[in-house]
């Protein structure tokens, strides 16, 4: 069966799989987040990639690229290579699920940690040409200088922005590395070295091969079951039904839409429709 995945040697920091792999390095993750948010993280207590959060068995779950905590902050970091719309409401949902999870574990409202959501976008999410969009809740009536101070912030990086002059050097260099793989700072040099070392590891290569083969199995198994179902209800109907199931499964496993397009042969609009219909 034809492979639709990048060869291991060609993976970059901007590929979802490698992004999560590199960001699991505590030092790199800490430095990237500090650079983006211009804050200090005292000590990371917890860091995980591809974490699934669900507030109840019946609730819609979310799967996060990177989630880390220190003593007073929870930070979610997402890499977005394609504009699937709805990022603002997705950020809102991430933070609400994170808060509910914390209170279910016994945390009082007043003790909730500050919550940050970061979207690193290879497109302009608000089409305003700005390199950096930061949002928090303020008073719209009379005095916008009054802040709600609920401890939540949402940050969107527009990696494609042309004018980065208002960003500091370290953040500019991170943009340049993500966009063009230019190494200009200690942080981007560390990321580049980690990338090279990871790609040189035989076990890491094997893990990636297992990952891609598992995804290819979705297609093979899906079409096989679809054809079998089609014997009873019509070949085309069976294949279409199973294709939708395969798409839903892949979306729930956080597979990028451009990858799903190549595997199942649907376009992005068709996949988005399936995503909406199944509340994935």
Question: Where are the model-predicted features located?
Answer:
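Accessory alpha/beta interaction modules
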Residues: 1-153, 165, 225
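Short, charged alpha-helical interaction segments and adjacent helix-coil junctions
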Residues: 2-9, 17, 71, 75-80, ...
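Hydrophobic residues at beta-strand termini and immediately following loops
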Residues: 157
């Amino acid at each position: 069966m034809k492979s639709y995945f990048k060869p291991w040697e060609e993976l970059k920091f901007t590929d979802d799989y490698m992004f999560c792999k590199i960001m699991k390095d505590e030092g790199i993750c800490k430095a990237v987040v500090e650079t983006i948010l211009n804050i200090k993280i005292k000590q990371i207590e917890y860091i995980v990639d591809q974490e699934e959060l669900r507030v109840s068995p019946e609730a819609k779950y979310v799967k996060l690229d990177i989630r880390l905590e220190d003593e007073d902050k929870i930070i979610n970091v997402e890499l977005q290579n394609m504009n699937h719309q709805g990022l603002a409401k997705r950020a809102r949902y991430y933070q609400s699920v994170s808060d509910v999870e914390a209170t279910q574990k016994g945390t009082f409202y007043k003790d909730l940690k500050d919550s940050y959501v970061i979207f690193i976008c290879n497109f302009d999410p608000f089409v305003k040409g700005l390199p950096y969009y930061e949002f928090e809740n303020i008073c719209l009536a009379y005095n916008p200088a009054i802040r709600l101070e609920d401890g939540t912030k949402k940050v969107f990086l527009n990696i494609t922005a042309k004018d980065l002059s208002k960003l500091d050097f370290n953040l500019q260099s991170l943009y340049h590395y993500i966009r063009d793989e230019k190494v200009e700072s200690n942080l981007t040099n560390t990321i580049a070295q980690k990338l090279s070392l990871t790609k040189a590891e035989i076990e890491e290569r094997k893990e990636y091969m297992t990952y891609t083969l598992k995804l290819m199995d979705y297609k093979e198994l899906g079409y096989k079951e679809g054809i079998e179902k089609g014997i009873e209800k019509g070949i085309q109907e069976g294949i279409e039904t199973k294709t939708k199931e395969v798409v839903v499964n892949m979306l729930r496993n956080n597979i990028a839409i451009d990858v799903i397009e190549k595997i199942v042969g649907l376009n992005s609009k068709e996949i988005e429709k399936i995503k909406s219909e199944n509340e994935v």
